[in-house]
Curated annotation (Swiss-Prot):
Note on cofactor: Binds 1 zinc ion per subunit.
Similarity comment text for this entry: Belongs to the class-I aminoacyl-tRNA synthetase family.
Assembly information from the UniProt record: Monomer.
GO cellular component, one term: cytosol
Protein EC: 6.1.1.16
Keywords, in A-Z order: Aminoacyl-tRNA synthetase, ATP-binding, Cytoplasm, Ligase, Metal-binding, Nucleotide-binding, Protein biosynthesis, Zinc
GO terms (BP aspect): cysteinyl-tRNA aminoacylation
Annotated protein name in UniProt: Cysteine--tRNA ligase
Reported cofactor(s): Zn(2+)
GO MF assignments: ATP binding; cysteine-tRNA ligase activity; zinc ion binding
SUPFAM superfamilies attached to this UniProt entry: Anticodon-binding domain of a subclass of class I aminoacyl-tRNA synthetases, Nucleotidylyl transferase
């Protein structure tokens, strides 16, 4: 899709700390996003990141780019091993239900599928090969605990993504944990030596002994195997900047000698009661929790899009209810468009102008670092303008179809608009509608009101128009 008045896409690059014009090195665009660690159900804070990444990919496609998208599935790391060992079951048996639940949640939130979902356990040989190369280069070493570590002192550019100055920090002890804070940059683990008490029966054989790969190495190898040595975009949550993405850069560039990714995009935290939503804090909600409260995936997706991805978003039930109301307004608008039946061969000039101006405003918002909240503002301005045109009585079926097509275009990015309002109306309700219409024709207003109340009690609203009654669910 071409936009004559838009210079190009601008993204905020974490590495440079500024907005940059997007100019990919590859066709299709190589996009890698960090996926779930399948030790539990993903919470809606995780899904804020996944929805942001979905908007990123949809925006690229909207602007005419083809994209190859890889999202990893982390099925072996500290937490999955601990979970499987605690239940005394094989690793795959432990992770498989959470993997399946993740894909179900993606569908519920209308998140477009990636092209590849590599599982870490499927790439162990490639990871062993990479560690062997790093050992041969002298960039990695075997510690006293028999684990293999990456030496930060052998990679001078370490810290360039998270903007760390190693000379001013305590460095470089060794750390075998997958996650740690940026005040303590350490030689990180590439291969974690097997510990029977900790790991049970979960290990792989390697030239450097039994064990399993470190979490950071897993993403590097899966990305490079499927997308090549250099990516166009690497995205994730702000939690991933350090140490995960910093370590990915170090080991990947040490292996290839090439820049690992050109653009780094990171989404901010989802808050609950003003605090970061986190499993470690115990203040998290899963998508399933919200579905059990009778919210919909559409409402949750809408809520997760209500602030710019680089701004923290505070979750409240009131905010989710407000999203339900906004979606109802949009649904009523679509229903009104579908109900237009005035004949017309072509859309009005004002309809064409309004649609063109809306698409331009929406596209400018996206091009400005995925400013979806501004895009929504332009959408509701557009809805108000078209409702005014309909009120004037000159809006034809051709106009309504053109507007519906415009909404479909923007929804290829948003993925949240209620673009169909058709529902199955029970025959009993339609019979009541017919009886009410007959009562109105005979001016039996008391009977018409009684039948209207029965229709309402059945969960439907009847609206009278020049072309006859229209029925829609409450």
């Amino acid at each position: 899709m071409a936009f004559s008045h838009i210079e190009g896409l601008y993204f905020y690059n974490t590495a440079s700390q500024k907005k940059e014009l997007f100019f990919p090195n590859h066709t299709p665009v190589r996009l890698y996003t960090c996926g779930p660690t399948v030790y539990d159900y993903a919470h809606i804070g995780n899904f804020r990141t996944y929805v942001f990444e979905d908007i990123l990919k949809r925006t690229l496609v909207f602007f005419g780019y083809s994209v190859t998208h890889v999202m990893n599935i982390t099925d072996v790391e500290d937490k999955t091993i601990a979970g499987a060992s605690k239940k005394n079951i094989p690793l795959q048996e432990y992770t498989q239900p959470y993997t399946e639940a993740f894909f179900e949640d993606l569908d519920t939130l209308n998140i477009a599928r990636a092209d590849f979902y590599p599982h870490a356990t499927h790439y162990i040989p490639q990871m062993i090969q990479a560690i062997t190369k790093l050992l041969e280069q002298g960039i990695a070493y075997i510690g006293q605990d028999a684990s293999v570590y990456f030496s930060l002192n052998r990679f001078p550019n370490y810290g360039k993504l998270s903007h760390l100055d190693l000379s001013s920090l305590r460095c470089c002890s060794r750390i075998s944990a997958d996650e740690y804070d940026k005040e303590n940059p350490s030689d990180f683990v590439l291969w974690k030596a097997y510990n029977p008490e900790r790991d049970g029966v979960i290990y792989w054989e390697s030239p450097f002994g039994k064990g399993r790969p470190g979490w950071h190495l897993e993403c590097s190898i899966m990305a490079m195997e499927l997308l090549g040595d250099s990516l166009d975009i690497h995205a994730g949550g702000v939690d991933n900047i350090f140490p995960h993405h910093e370590n990915e850069i170090a080991q990947s560039e040490a292996l290839s000698g090439k820049p690992f990714a050109r653009y780094w995009l990171h989404s901010e935290h989802l808050l609950i009661d003003g605090k970061k939503m986190s499993k470690s804090l115990g203040n998290f909600l899963t998508l399933r929790d919200l579905l059990h409260q009778e919210f919909t995936g559409q409402e949750v997706r809408y809520m997760l899009l209500q602030s710019h991805y680089r701004t923290q978003l505070n979750f409240t039930e009131e905010a989710l209810l407000a999203c339900r109301h906004a979606l109802r307004r949009l649904k009523d608008f679509v229903s009104r468009l579908e109900g237009v039946d005035l004949p017309g061969e072509s859309p009005l000039p004002r309809t064409l102008d309004s649609s063109s101006q809306f698409i331009e405003a929406f596209s400018r918002a996206l091009a400005n670092d995925l400013n979806v909240s501004t895009g929504f503002a332009s959408l509701f301005d557009f809805v108000h303008e078209i409702n005014t045109l309909i009120d004037q009585g000159h809006f034809s079926k051709a106009d309504s179809l053109y507007i519906l097509d415009t909404l479909k275009k923007v929804d290829t990015v948003l993925g949240v608009l209620p673009l169909t309002t058709s529902v199955c109306i029970p025959e009993t309700v339609m019979q009541l509608v017919a009886e009410r219409e007959e009562a109105r024709k005979t001016k039996n207003w008391a009977m018409a009101d009684t039948l209207r109340d029965e229709i309402l009690a059945a969960g439907f609203l009847v609206e009278d128009s020049k072309s006859g009654p229209k029925v829609k669910p409450l």
